Amino acid sequence: MTLYCKRGYKGYLYLEDGTLIEGCGFGAKGIRAGEVVFTTSMNGYPESLTDPSYRGQILVITHPLVGNYGVPEKQRVEGILTNFESEQIQVEGLVVSEETDPFKWNSSKSLHEWLLSEGVPGLSDVDTRSIVKKVRSRGVMMGVIASGYEIEDPKKFLEKKYDEIDFTQFTSPKAPIVHLGNTGETIVVVDCGVKHGILYQLHQRGFTIVRVPCKFNVSKIMDYYPKGVVFGNGPGNPNLLQEVIENFKELTEYKIPILGICLGHQVATLAMGGKVNKMKFGHRAINKPVIDISSNKCYITTHNHGYGILSKEDLPPNSKLWFINPDDGTIEGWIHEKLPIITTQFHPEARPGPWDVTWVFDKFKKMVSRNA
């Protein structure tokens, strides 16, 4: 059967196990390589595609229709985006079952137009369920996405593995960025690719936020006299970030409150003597349950991580379990028993996702206020 492609060109996805999937191209024509991962989120593709944690990855969205509500115009509060997670699309490529035209009053462009304008290839009209089943059974693998081109020698694009690249070099700012607050309390965000949703939640609590590069010197961080420090999310293998890990250790000597989120949770774990390992296919969804051990309450949370603390034995010394995932037992947060450090593997800010656990930021604010 002849494949009809509404954008006029075909596309392909090559997986490192030799699987070749043919579909229709959309967005920009081009060839890109990346780690193939999937999200089960049913909405929030503008936020997902701009999440720096997806840098270096080809994202497969399991929901069958993607693009229905288009792409909105960027909106900001004190320089912080309120409807995107960064200034640009971060994924290497996008794979969907069906790319649809938008029908919503505030759409400024279609998904196709957005990817086209930012040079990102897309692939549609493929069986995303079969891709997800393969990734779920075999584990994440490298792949090559081609839109408007055939992949003649895919292996040449796969010479370097995702786990071997420090992607924070592409997602961390080159110089400090300040977002003014109204409480007089200044916090520093160590920005390895932080989501604007995290910045927004911090700004809503009145903080003046100083975003510093991922590998910013600790003495320069302390020049801002921060009342607290946040290590936010970001892409890639945390075990490669030895400079960031050492900076975290050095910061603990000042005994100021620290909040680690996602990659920040992993950096904190490694810095304090715990272990972080690669997961088979990770958690990428907006409906993952976590249990708060202190209250025995279950919350529905947003996740985007391919590494984690896989068991209680991997927790750092002098830490106590805070959150655990009831599905697979992975550690979703811990609290240090001697230092003012709290961490979550999940995203308390959501974006996209439920706001069940935004109170984590309130807990951090109380820690900062006590320190002030």
UniProtKB/Swiss-Prot annotation:
It comes from the Archaea. L-glutamine binds at residues 53, 234, 236, 263, 266, 304, 306-307. GO terms for molecular function: ATP binding; carbamoyl-phosphate synthase (glutamine-hydrolyzing) activity; glutaminase activity. GO terms for biological process: 'de novo' pyrimidine nucleobase biosynthetic process; 'de novo' UMP biosynthetic process; glutamine metabolic process; L-arginine biosynthetic process. It catalyses: hydrogencarbonate + L-glutamine + 2 ATP + H2O = carbamoyl phosphate + L-glutamate + 2 ADP + phosphate + 2 H(+). The keyword Cytoplasm does not apply. Residues 186-372 form the Glutamine amidotransferase type-1 domain. Its EC number is 6.3.5.5. The keyword Translocase does not apply. Gene3D superfamilies: 3.40.50.880, Carbamoyl-phosphate synthase small subunit, N-terminal domain. Belongs to the CarA family. Composed of two chains; the small (or glutamine) chain promotes the hydrolysis of glutamine to ammonia, which is used by the large (or ammonia) chain to synthesize carbamoyl phosphate. Tetramer of heterodimers (alpha,beta)4. Small subunit of the glutamine-dependent carbamoyl phosphate synthetase (CPSase). CPSase catalyzes the formation of carbamoyl phosphate from the ammonia moiety of glutamine, carbonate, and phosphate donated by ATP, constituting the first step of 2 biosynthetic pathways, one leading to arginine and/or urea and the other to pyrimidine nucleotides. The small subunit (glutamine amidotransferase) binds and cleaves glutamine to supply the large subunit with the substrate ammonia. This is Carbamoyl phosphate synthase small chain. It comes from Sulfurisphaera tokodaii (strain DSM 16993 / JCM 10545 / NBRC 100140 / 7).
